[in-house]
C-alpha cells in the first residue's frame, strides 16, 4: 500500500486581490525533498485503527501527482521552496544530477534556493544548477536576498544574476504574478558553506523592496517563495505590505488535518494571517522528503 497524500486547496479570487473568479489559479508546491527520490517503506500510519507500515512518497510519485493535479487546468503554477539536494545517497553519488533530471520532469515555474543548496559552496551549487539548466524547462532560480560577489563567486561568470534572480514574473491566463525568492540568511551562513564573499541580506527588508518594485510596475499579485521556516513566514507575512501568498520551506512543516492517519500537524492548510495592509495572506508548506504535494 502506498501513502501519497495531496493536500487540496485552490488559491482562488478571495485569496489574491484583483483576480477574477474566472481566472482561478492553482498552485502546486513541494519543499525540502533533500534528494529523497525513492519511495520510503518505513512510514507507519494509523489505518482503520491499526498501526500500519506503508510505502510512501518518492519523486516519481511527485511527478505523477503534479501531472494529475494539473490535468484539465489552464492556470497552474508549480513551485519548489528549496532544499532539493543533500540528505540521501542520491546526492552523495550524483551531486544533484538525479534530482535535476526528476525536477525537470515536473518543470517548475520557480525554484527558491535553500540553505542546503550551499552545502558544497557556490561551486557545488553551480554544478547542480548546470544539471538543472540542461533540461528544457529553464526553471528560474530565485533568492532575492542572496548576493554572490561578481567576479569572485562561480555563480557570477558574467554578472551577479547569471544563475540567481531576485524574482520572476509569470503570466497565467492574463494574470501577471510576481514570485520573489527568499532564503534563510543566518542559517545558511552559519550551518552551510557558501563562499565567504556571498552576501545574505535581511529577509524582511529584501522582500518588501522587491514587492514595492513589482507593484510599481503594476504587478499586484505577489507570491513569496521562501526557505525561511513556517513560524518565520507567519511573522514575515504580518510585517509586509502587498503580499498575498507565501509558499515556504525549511521547517519541514506538515499542515492540514491528518489526525485520522496518526500524523501531527502544525496548523491549518493554508494558515491565514493578515499582512500590514490588513489583507489576508495564505501561508503554506508541504512537509518533506517527496511525501506530499501541496495544492
Protein language model features and the residues they cover:
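Gram-negative bacterial Sec-dependent N-terminal signal peptides
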Residues: 2-21
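Acidic, metal/ion-coordinating pockets
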Residues: 22-295
Amino acid at each position: 500500500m502506498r501513502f501519497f497524500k495531496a493536500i487540496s486547496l485552490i488559491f482562488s479570487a478571495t485569496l489574491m486581490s484583483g483576480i477574477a473568479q474566472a481566472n482561478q489559479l492553482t498552485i502546486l508546491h513541494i519543499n525540502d525533498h533533500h534528494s529523497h527520490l525513492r519511495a520510503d517503506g518505513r512510514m507507519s500510519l494509523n489505518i482503520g485503527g491499526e498501526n500500519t507500515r506503508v510505502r510512501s512518497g518518492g519523486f516519481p510519485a511527485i511527478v505523477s501527482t503534479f501531472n494529475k493535479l494539473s490535468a484539465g487546468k489552464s492556470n497552474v503554477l508549480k513551485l519548489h521552496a528549496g532544499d532539493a539536494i543533500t540528505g540521501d545517497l542520491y546526492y552523495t553519488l550524483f551531486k544533484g544530477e538525479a534530482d535535476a533530471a526528476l525536477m525537470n520532469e515536473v518543470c517548475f515555474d520557480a525554484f527558491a534556493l535553500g540553505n542546503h543548496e550551499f552545502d558544497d559552496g557556490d561551486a557545488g551549487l553551480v554544478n547542480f544548477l548546470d544539471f538543472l539548466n540542461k533540461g528544457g524547462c529553464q526553471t528560474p532560480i530565485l533568492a532575492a536576498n542572496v548576493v554572490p560577489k561578481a567576479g569572485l563567486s562561480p555563480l557570477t561568470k558574467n554578472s551577479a544574476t547569471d544563475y540567481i534572480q531576485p524574482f520572476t514574473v509569470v503570466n497565467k491566463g492574463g494574470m501577471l504574478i510576481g514570485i520573489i525568492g527568499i532564503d534563510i540568511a543566518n542559517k545558511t551562513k552559519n550551518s552551510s558553506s557558501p563562499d565567504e564573499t556571498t552576501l545574505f541580506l535581511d529577509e524582511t527588508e529584501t522582500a518588501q523592496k522587491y514587492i514595492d518594485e513589482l507593484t510599481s510596475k503594476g504587478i499586484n499579485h505577489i507570491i513569496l517563495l521562501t526557505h525561511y521556516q513556517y513560524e518565520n513566514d507567519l511573522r514575515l507575512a504580518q510585517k509586509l505590505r502587498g503580499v498575498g501568498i507565501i509558499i515556504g520551506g525549511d521547517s519541514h512543516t506538515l499542515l492540514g488535518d491528518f489526525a485520522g492517519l496518526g500524523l501531527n500537524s502544525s496548523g491549518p492548510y493554508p494558515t491565514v494571517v493578515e499582512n500590514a495592509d490588513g489583507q489576508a495572506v495564505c501561508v503554506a508548506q508541504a512537509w518533506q522528503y517527496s511525501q506530499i504535494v501541496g495544492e
